[in-house]
Amino acid sequence: MSHLTTFKNNALTNTKRDLLAKSVAEITGLELDYNHKNIKNTWINETVDASFKYNGKHIAVGLRFETNADGEEEAVVAGDFYGTGLNQEELTNKIAQVYQKNKVIETCLEANWFIDQDQITTESNGDIVIEAYRYA
């Protein structure tokens, strides 16, 4: 059934917007468009901070950046998932997981750790394994 929903994930608090866009782009068929700020279909017409493109087409799903009770900015997935072929909870969790992976990699590299991108693996349970090395 078509309706507007919002979905949050604590891992998407205090996000770096450029790193978030990079993370979304790593998910097959998905892209984040910061220039397209209106999502709509027959049932909804909402303003967002960025919209999603899925398989090259804008869909009625986007991101809003809201301030939570602690005063921190958090990315909230909002929109109408009906007919997109996407699941709101799975999508939000996948974005959060890939974002956290990229955040760990960025933090390690800033601290002069070496990460072989080819050695990053995903376990059968979905956990991402990153090996970081530091030479003395």
Q: Where are each of the predicted segments found?
A:
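Interaction-mediating elements
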Residues: M1-A136
